[in-house]
């Protein structure tokens, strides 16, 4: 999840000019605006990457939530899908399931993207204006806007009761049992500890359940809309093939075409693509590198250190 959600959960268009395919090592400064094919271990032109993603039946666009360049790329992918003649649903982690009816009603009544954010209760905790352009694009083309996220009350119940809080038989139906093993559990646990700035408190095991439930429910919602295709806006951790939404999609609909994109911020300490954990095989299909958003170190506040203003 990303910094805005770490307290409880995990994991410019001018920079998007197409780049020639290239196998040479790249320094951090040269990675921004470049796309990497994880399986082929090579750079691809961003135009090619955009087209491949837009053509997928289900495109999972894994973002850093507060990076506006990521939202611009996501909108460009949705626009490319429309240009291809596709009419996918826009599915959003930023909207909790409990507000779906309110969002549908607002859209039917001709609400603005800002009013959709209010109907979705997404104006607090999310930078909703950054998502508004892609919502506007969906609305102007009469695409469904689909809520993906578990309601907060349900996540609180999972913390207290575990996966049983999903209801009788739901863990089986959602493939939570069939997909899981001790190795995956340990890997996700490490990711959550890292996302909490190294804090390995007892709550971590409960957050593993929350993350698994979120991913499985997101997959369920995507499957419901998959007949028309889906462009999903979600945190990068949710888009991971080895731990996130694709795991549950593959278990329940193995023939479904899913493409996972990781939008990755440049790390000044990295010397090339291979230094990024996202570039390991089996995590994503494509990576798209961007400059990092300006933000305070979230670990300062997490550890009780005053954050400079």
Outline where the language-model segments fall.
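Membrane-embedded segments
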Residues: 67-71, 87-89, 97-104
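N-terminal secretory signal peptides and thylakoid transit peptides that target proteins
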Residues: 1-14
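Hydrophobic h-region of N-terminal signal peptides that target proteins for export
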Residues: 13-21
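C-terminal regions of proteins
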Residues: 217-220, 238-309
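A substrate-binding/cap region within the structured catalytic cores of diverse enzymes
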Residues: 101-225
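Short internal beta-strands
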Residues: 89-94, 260-262
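Zymogen propeptides
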Residues: 41-42, 46-82
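N- or domain-start disorder-to-order transition segments that initiate the globular core
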Residues: 20-56
């Amino acid at each position: 999840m990303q910094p805005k959600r770490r307290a409880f959960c995990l994991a410019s268009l001018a920079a998007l000019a197409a780049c020639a395919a290239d196998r040479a090592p790249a320094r951090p400064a040269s990675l921004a605006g470049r796309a990497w094919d994880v399986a082929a271990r090579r750079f691809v032109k961003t135009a090619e990457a955009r087209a491949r993603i837009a053509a997928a039946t289900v495109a999972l666009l894994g973002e850093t939530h507060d990076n506006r360049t990521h939202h611009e790329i996501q909108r460009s992918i949705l626009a490319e899908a429309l240009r291809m003649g596709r009419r996918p649903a826009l599915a959003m982690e930023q909207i909790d399931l409990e507000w779906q009816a309110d969002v549908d009603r607002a859209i039917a009544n001709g609400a603005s993207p800002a009013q959709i954010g209010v109907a979705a209760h997404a104006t607090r905790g999310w930078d909703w204006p950054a998502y508004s352009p892609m919502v506007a694009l969906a609305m102007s083309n009469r695409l469904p806007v689909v809520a993906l996220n578990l309601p907060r009350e349900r996540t609180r119940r999972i913390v207290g009761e575990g996966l049983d809080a999903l209801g009788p038989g739901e863990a089986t139906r959602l493939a939570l049992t069939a997909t899981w093993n001790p190795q995956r559990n340990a890997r996700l646990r490490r990711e959550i500890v890292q996302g909490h700035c190294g804090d390995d408190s007892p709550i971590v095991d409960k957050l593993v359940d929350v993350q698994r439930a979120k991913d499985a429910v997101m997959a369920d919602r995507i499957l419901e809309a998959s007949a028309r295709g889906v462009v999903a806006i979600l945190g990068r951790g949710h888009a991971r093939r080895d731990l996130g939404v694709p795991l549950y999609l593959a278990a329940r609909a193995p023939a479904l075409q899913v493409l996972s994109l990781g939008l990755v911020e440049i790390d000044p300490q990295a010397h090339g693509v291979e230094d990024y954990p996202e570039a390991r095989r089996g995590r994503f299909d494509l990576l798209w590198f961007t400059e990092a958003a300006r933000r305070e170190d979230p670990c300062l506040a997490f550890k009780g250190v005053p954050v400079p203003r």
